[in-house]
Swiss-Prot record:
Keywords: Cell cycle, Cell division, Cell shape, Cell wall biogenesis/degradation, Cytoplasm, Peptidoglycan synthesis, Pyruvate, Transferase. Transmembrane segments: none annotated. It is an enzyme of class 2 (transferase). This is UDP-N-acetylglucosamine 1-carboxyvinyltransferase. The gene is murA. One of its GO terms (biological process) is cell wall organization. UDP-N-acetyl-alpha-D-glucosamine binds at residues 94, 163-166, 308, 330.
Length: 421
């Protein structure tokens, strides 16, 4: 365990290179299980979630080679149902549910522990299991385990998700690429990370159309090839550092970004008073305003405002000049950071799914506790703007989704340091 000490009150100024997207890296890493050939993945962020997923794949028999920093080569030519993914790691990662489909397709049977992850609401797996069953899998839940088998090759289906789900969309896509026949998926999640997975699978030989839309069509192939693929930049990391500039009235240049992926965040930041200029094809400069204007924000599936930026924007709105209303429509329990922000002087009232944020002139430093990945970084952001020193505890959450955050902030003159508890 470790903490981050943040001394606030300094405008951030500098340049940050955005890392590869965690939420694209994880499913693409899992996709290596779909082929016996080598998949080389570039722009892989160095995160604990990535390390844990690679460890899970190693336990399944995948050969993992670190080619160089940010590049890995995965070869799944020796996987076996006799390998057992480690329960302690599977249980703490909700993304581990994705190994079910490829292992089932390759081996015909699989048994894994129920997945975990951040303690945010009811991140259920029922949509994943419904998709697997529709493709022909037999599923049994045994206390803390999922057992699945498929007596023959999975078959193509027409399937409409009951609700938009990033994770279940990924599971269904992985089933469909090797299923026998044609699959039509409706009401799919449209996140860029799902499109990135599809483009990687297409490079491996998958037949996929409708990428990036709510309706995806896939014609199954008998086998996939290897490929060399680069992961898209992390739009959530980029949005986080944009808030860092805005909340400190600073000026930061961000490199390796995709503008269209940031459209909703950029729109809200401009409404708050920030000045954002595009520099070239993949760089932008954001300059924070002296007076931050309040916002109304509703989280919804892409291309709308992302739930993964809700906590960061709440920190920003806590010092806005007026009242903001933030509505969390994705998860029912994603306001755990609110109680920590209140310790720092924020004026926030929760009413069901709404957070009513009345801006204060200044936050003050305090000892606060991170409860999940995005909450942890929102508290660091609040600390950057606060008077005095903020200590954010349980920073292992941060390591799951932010590569070198302390170093990147220090490069922008932030007074932050990591210390052991």
């Amino acid at each position: 365990m470790s903490s981050i000490l943040v001394e606030g009150g300094k405008s951030l100024r500098g340049e940050i290179n955005i890392s590869g997207a965690k939420n694209a890296a994880l499913p693409i890493i899992v996709a290596s299980l779909l082929s016996s050939k080598t998949l080389v993945i570039n722009n892989v962020p160095q995160l604990s979630d990535v390390s844990d997923m690679l460890f899970i794949l190693k336990s399944c028999g995948v050969h993992v080679e670190i080619v160089e920093s940010g590049t890995i080569a995965l070869t799944a030519n020796n996987i076996s149902c006799h390998f057992s993914p480690p329960c302690n790691i599977v249980k703490k990662m909700r993304a581990s549910i994705w190994i079910l489909a490829p292992l089932l397709l390759r081996l015909g049977q699989v048994r894994i522990a129920l997945p975990g992850g951040c303690a945010i609401g009811q991140r259920r797996i029922d949509l994943h299991l419904a998709a697997l069953k529709a493709f022909g899998a037999n599923i049994q839940l045994e206390e803390d385990y999922i057992s699945a088998n498929c007596s023959s090759r999975m078959h193509g289906i027409s399937f409409k998700f009951d609700k938009v789900s990033v994770g279940a969309t990924i599971t269904a896509i992985m089933c469909a690429v090797l299923a026998n026949g044609s699959t039509k998926l409706a009401n799919c999640a449209q996140e860029p990370e799902i499109a990135d997975l599809c483009y990687c699978l297409r490079k491996m030989g998958a037949n996929i159309t409708g990428i990036g839309t709510a309706n995806i069509s896939i014609i199954g192939v008998k086998e996939l090839n290897g490929a060399n693929y680069s992961i898209i930049p992390d739009r959530i990391e980029a949005g986080t550092y944009m808030v860092a500039a805005a909340i400190t009235q600073g000026k930061i240049k961000l490199n390796n970004v995709i503008f269209k992926h940031l459209k909703s965040a950029i729109t809200k930041l401009r409404l708050s008073g920030a000045i954002i200029q595009y520099q070239n094809e993949n760089s932008l400069i954001i300059e924070g305003a002296n007076i931050i204007k309040p916002l109304n924000i509703q989280t919804n599936p892409y291309p709308n405002f992302p739930t993964d930026l809700q906590a960061q924007f709440m920190s920003l709105m806590s010092i806005a000049d007026g009242v903001s209303i933030i509505t969390e429509n994705i998860y029912e329990n994603r306001y755990m950071h609110v109680f920590e922000l209140i310790k720092m002087g924020a004026n926030i009232v929760i009413q069901s799914r709404e957070a009513i944020v009345t801006g204060v002139k200044k936050l003050h430093g305090a000892d606060v506790i991170a409860t999940d990945l995005r909450a942890s970084v929102s508290l660091v952001l609040a600390g950057l703007s606060a008077a005095g020193i903020t200590r954010v505890k349980r920073m292992h959450h941060l390591d799951r989704g932010y590569e070198s955050l302390v170093e990147k902030l220090q490069n922008c003159n932030a007074r932050v340091q990591r210390i052991p508890d």
